[in-house]
Design a protein with these regions (language model features):
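Mixed-charge, Lys/Arg-enriched low-complexity segments
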Residues: 4-6, 65-103
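Acidic, low-complexity, intrinsically disordered interaction modules
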Residues: 20-84
Length: 103
């Protein structure tokens, strides 16, 4: 199974709609002059989703040997309107989750 097929399966499972791969977009996000995210965001057309016609998806290295890869999907809903803003939304969610876990 290819990465694209894996991501299509995850989109179907999480969002309940089929997805067709549209394009692969390289994204690099920096903060204070340092690269904090660098990878390929896969863009999918969604078929029948009630709120959007696009999803962004990629694989994320968790750094956890027991669960090394995470499939990430972000729907094209404000503020995630481009591959870059989808990555930014993901990063912000990760920061919020980490802060909540520490509280």
């Amino acid at each position: 199974m290819t990465v694209i097929q894996e991501l299509q399966d995850v989109i179907l499972k999480l969002h309940g709609v089929k997805a067709t791969h549209r394009e692969s977009v390289p994204v690099t996000e920096t903060w204070q002059g340092k690269t904090i995210w660098d990878g390929i965001v896969e863009v999918f057309d969604l078929h029948g989703h009630p709120k959007t016609d696009t999803a962004y998806a990629w694989l994320h290295d968790t750094g956890d040997p027991s669960d090394p890869i995470r499939h990430v999907t972000v729907l094209r809903i404000h503020p995630a309107l481009t591959p870059l803003t989808a990555v930014r939304s993901f990063i912000m969610q990760e920061i919020q989750n980490a802060n909540a876990a520490q509280a």
